[in-house]
């Protein structure tokens, strides 16, 4: 869903960089070298501060080793080789005089997020702490600095008593000796890495023996024995589960390969990633509020790529960057490959650490290779220019406000005459920071992905793919690359970057974007952006969830002056005009929304209520929003923020119920974390409505619901992209009606009027809570009646499963590349991958997205035939019968059935396809069979002839339709399969027919074929003599001569 696209750049440093990391929540990053701390602003890319140690400080503290940054309290903590932790306080002040890029310019051009230009960064040195046990690693948890000892498995937590920059900073410390707890398995190992994720409120530790531990509540515990932790990643356990074990291989070597080298988390999908020494990335699913971890997926890039150095997840959780010693790869949340350095020869470099930009449109990675002062990479022959920086010294440290940044285009072999500046220290190294630009699919910023339209976004524009507009052309080309570029309004993106949400209408006619504040609507037909007229009003509004289009209206959940509101916009002018705007207030933040029908929607809020809202246009032509009803979901969801989408599905039998009762009869499709679950109503004797939970699919990255009725066979079909591939359910609503709900009993058993407080009752709500994470900032505080102990929830996860009928109806689809969207009206899957290029003139290296389009109809029809649903398969094929490539689709169906590995399944498929073709005679199916024969190896021909007729039967159909070209193709197949003599007379008849109708292409083809059979051209001469005598000629001698020559061909 992220694709390398554009021209990568690089920043070169004149000293060896140890670590780079982004300052959370702001567009700044820090570079740590052995003697310096460099602070860069990303937009515009500028070095705004540099802290350099004095000689005295360097001798006392030693070289820098590790760095950790916290933006909430403005803390920078640096660990040194002499066991000191230096603590700094920084503030970013945009109100200070703007720093200019050069003496000749007054300000930067306002690109995305650059309206303030370079911002003043003020830094204060606050204190230094020395830890006698040595410093192995450190991390910042809120206002506490956590670090691990270098001599024993001991964790030290130093909490700042105050973070006021105007006061003297002091710390209070406590220590945890992990040798006192049983869950820390190897007491002789050390803690080599600390990782804290505030979103899931969990600390992760990596030990020197390659294990990974999870810990809940380090700072809240007062002694070591009260710590709760568990081992998540154990190389010994992974080694036992290997299926390809070699008994002669050294066990210690295998354990060393499985040792963890790096870890990261994905809070949006509740996943923990662990990289190992052999280059494998493991994904662990977090269950039972962080108390259980299950290894579900793994990915290994290449044996030559080396160990995993770094793993970084985007803010939306939809992309994972993995850096190796020699290469990099981007993966989907469940470790499906999206893009890799091996796909292009120009950007094949290793990454030691890095981070995603705030809008995830770029990745900043520190190269794994260091360079000497001669410009030569350590261990390689790669040369690169060096950029010198003048260093200054003060007694303690100094902060430089401005420094030039050199950004150059990447070049694998830099043969230009670069000036290598002299550096006093001959042992000094340089490092390179690579900036990789990415295109981001709009799927990641939408509440529910749309069909028919594919979009990709960068920092300053949106790309809309128009490939589908060419699918009905006469050219049989599925891979046309054509994009419409929609540039964001410059003033808006300059001040409100990053663009957090993008919503595209199903037909691509309307687009909405939302940044930090306000929003904007683009009308494609007019090529016009509509924004707020009042800039102050725009600053008061912030969109809280993905926006949705319904008809010509845009629906957005916003926070406006601390009020939680639903806004309804009409794209006909400025967004703050009364005629184009309607509002409805709520008691809490809107988490997600979905459309029910043409004029209604459901809204889910953070206080755990699901609301049914209706909108319309009144008699005066103004928009109106009306509240219908609500349901309390507090007993069902414990963490509302984990709910990514809620879709209301109404069974066909209940289509005419009153709108006010809609929530109490419908089925709810809920995407929570990576689980797609169904909530259906279950009748009880107490006449209360109970929700029954069933899991439809796990490891869900995104899904589509087809609401278009242009293709009736796919109406209400659901397409789900999971960690194991694309899955499809046809006629989804009908399956729901037949499996989950006994509609008649439900209606008869319900009272006409129910008290609202009794509409939802507790049944198996624990099953939905199993996948939620433990986090005080995300857990909804329920009443006393809803409290429960979550320690036993993991036992119930096996009971959460969908019925067998749903599993049987599931169709698995293959998608080559990374799926962008489903073009249901054209029967195509739209995928993408990256290609690298190099301009030979200026040697610029760049990458661009390449579109691939593949028909999905063969796999669906194949699956329907295996499910004994031939009538449904026939209807589906006839629905797409107008497409110019329908014959190609049916031919692919036949060839895939022929190449099925399972022999019994293959026979069933070929038999079903033959019956299918008999009911599709209007498609001239004999041509499809001939096309498949021409492209299939001869060893498979007997199976085709068994079910679709011998060559003479196919020839008969060709002659009945007077299709000379197909007859010529069939003749060649006949000759190869049964010999030349068996088709000699038929050969002459077809040759004569082609001459009669003056089809010279067929004549030339047949003549060439005779020459290939008899290079001496006796066959061709005899055939021409026979045909030259006319159709009434009965020269037996020439006929016998032609037959004898054909028999001679068969002998050889």
UniProtKB/Swiss-Prot annotation:
UniProt KW Cell inner membrane keyword: no
Subcellular location per the Swiss-Prot or TrEMBL entry: Golgi apparatus membrane
Coiled-coil ranges from the UniProt annotation: none
Transmembrane segments: 661-681
Record-level GO BP terms: intracellular protein transport; positive regulation of TORC2 signaling; retrograde transport, endosome to Golgi
Membrane topology per record: Single-pass membrane protein
Phosphotyrosine modified-residue sites: 293
One Pfam family named in its UniProt record: RIC1
Subunit: Component of a guanine nucleotide exchange factor (GEF) complex.
Annotated family: Belongs to the RIC1 family.
PANTHER family: GUANINE NUCLEOTIDE EXCHANGE FACTOR SUBUNIT RIC1, RAB6A-GEF COMPLEX PARTNER PROTEIN 1
Name under which the protein is recorded: Guanine nucleotide exchange factor subunit ric1
Gene: ric1
